[in-house]
Amino acid sequence: MGSRLNLLAMLALLAPAAPAAVQLIEGPTPIPGGNARAAHDLTVVNERLAFALAVGSSPPYGVPRGALIDLAPVSGGQIGPDRVVFADFIPNNWSAWPNTYQRVDVLERGPDTVRIRAVRDFGQARIETLYTLAAGADRVAISATMTNEGAAALPQLLSGLTLWPSSGFLFPLPGLAGVTSGSATGALARRVSAYDATWTITLHAPYAQQVGSGSRDLFLRHTLAPQESRTFSGWLQVGARGDLAPVLEAEIAQQQLPAGELSGSLRGAARDARADFVVVIEKQGQPYAWTRGRAGHYRVRLPVGQYSLYATARNFARSTPLSVTVSADSARTLDFSAPAGPGRLAFAVRDARSHAPLDARIVVEAGEQPVVEFLGRRTFFTALDPPGQLEVPIAPGPYRLRVTAGGGVLAREEHVAASVRPGATTRRAVDITRTFDPPARGWYAADLHHHADQAEAVTPPADLARSQLAAGLDLLFVSDHDSTANHAALAALARARHVPFIPGIELSPSWGHFNAYPLTPGAALEIDTGTAPVGAILAAARRAGASVVQVNHPFIPYGYFSSVAAGVAPGGFDGSFDLMEINSTVPEDDARVLAQLWQYWNQGRAYYLSAGSDTHDVWNEQSGRVRVFVHVDGPLSVAAFAAGLKAGHAYVTYGPIIYPATMFGTQLPAHSGAALAFDVGSVAGLSKVELIGDGERRETRTLEGAPVSAQVSFAADPRLHWYALTVEDQAGRRAYSDPIWLSTPPEAHLP
């Protein structure tokens, strides 16, 4: 009854004629699609926004309870869909979070202000976070104080607030586009915005000196002496329209910046452009912000400075850019001429030999690439049905496009020029010659770390399928964080395209991630990965049907092997996994993964290689950037693929192809004359081949003339225990193999 009364009170609060007020609701959140569903979770709502704290629910990524996990705009008395998976403080990058307690207290209950305090521990540190929402405010104030209660200093921490959206697009710190992690020096503002056409969420973090995860994490690097405290203050600003003008207004007010106003109109434009156009604002040659016009007019306040502005709309060209100097308290008029309207672009992609249609990925290399991503894509995929076909609206103008079928592994990419005119369709037919056909020799590829649209991932199942097929992968695969929600949809898509589907999950505690697959149809996560020790997590994977468990990105800050080394993995080291992952988001860790596996092979332990791209967004990341090839005897099936992978009949590759005369994971036959022979290749041309024996480089062959394919053979030293191969091509891409044993292969791990 209490929960129902709270909901009725909230509805009264959100009525258009209601006075400004803020309401606290205990229980499952009323935010549509929200994840705070437990009896004691807290939702705070006013007439501009709603947010929810996980008190009883389990936050994502193994973060302790007491965190902000839902956030949504409110417009016209209606709460919009949840737009975040997590937006809160993290104490030391995405590393393990050792935790023993959480307390959440309500300090003020409204109607003018709601203030909530969450207290949690992080090892020897105490973290107290205050969340404040006032009536009528469009932003949540967050203040996190971290205190070292231990006897030793906590050095070189990367602490700060984060914004992990669950949908839409991300506009990183202005001036830092393309910077995944590192210094925020050069940033034009200390804010990051998640957005789509109907909403914005902006994290303002004035303290930020470092960025992580492509500006989703805004950090300060610091050291906490014993008993020392440091406070991190920021704001989560929410809007019900994809417009950054209110964000600029808030930034000006928060920092007390001198500012002026620009306003104007879009002259001569068609009705659809005038109704909903965008003015993009650049500063120092970098995208800085944008504002959306209404009925042909716009208005925006900007800090004092020099800017360049242009107008555009969905699939429209850009207007001629205009330069302007904004001075304090100025008010200037800046009108734009109408940009050219949309054209269409159509592709037909096929195999040059058989003329069969090919799934393809098409990327704009040169031409219009909208800064505001809801105005148009830069990456496209051919249709699932009919395959090989694409037709899309696009801004007019000249283009250079890169077309790939096979992810640059099976065939060379093609570069296509096209000129698109307003109101017309430009058609291009592209024939692609496949250089390699691994399935003809029993080799099949998959990307064994790939997300769809759960948690922070933004790829619907159909687009995952289009992307993986365009990469030339032979099996579809998904591994969403702690979720099996997309299994049924992807199974149906795979059946329609007559390809196998491997249903997986990424088990995601704060101290290490594990992919488990193939899962039993209908299986769901049975444990809380935020509190369970490693043994319970791996056991749950096996109960769900997984014959294969791989350790994902083992050596990143929150990777399992890093956490074991730091003593923060609950349960310590548990060896009941099967594979270690080469992850293309951290290629600098490849050598560490290989060194660990080589050590295991020296010990006669049957842990083998896996590979995954860790793709979350197929339009801005590449499925199959690294992939695993597995040899299967007979017809391809999920069970046969998993068995071959687990038996070490595999190699991982960023590009080169390997066909061994003696199968990886098996024993070199005595009658072979102790010779190791391989066919190798790469569409980019080969550079060198390295033979690894017992963990050391035994021989390197440089391949002169950059051949596309070659045969190499080596004499085997019978005193060694195993050999493996590394192949590098002219593009610097590598392939790494599982071992060929010179003695009886060790037994694979039993599930």
Q: Residues of each region from the PLM?
A:
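Beta-strand-rich recognition/accessory modules
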Residues: 24-32, 36-38, 43-45, 56-58, ...
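Extended, loop-rich substrate-binding clefts of extracytoplasmic carbohydrate-active enzymes
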Residues: 36, 86-137, 149, 211-216
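Short, well-ordered beta-strand segments enriched in hydrophobic/aromatic residues
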Residues: 44, 51, 140-148, 678
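Acidic (Asp/Glu-rich), glycine- and aromatic
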Residues: 136-175
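Short, conserved beta-strand segments of beta-strand-rich sandwich/propeller modules, principally
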Residues: 141, 306-308, 344, 398-400, ...
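Charged catalytic cores and adjacent phosphate/nucleic-acid-binding surfaces used
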Residues: 268-270, 326-383, 390-392, 404, ...
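A short, solvent-exposed beta-strand micro-motif common in secreted/extracellular proteins
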Residues: 304-315, 362, 396-407
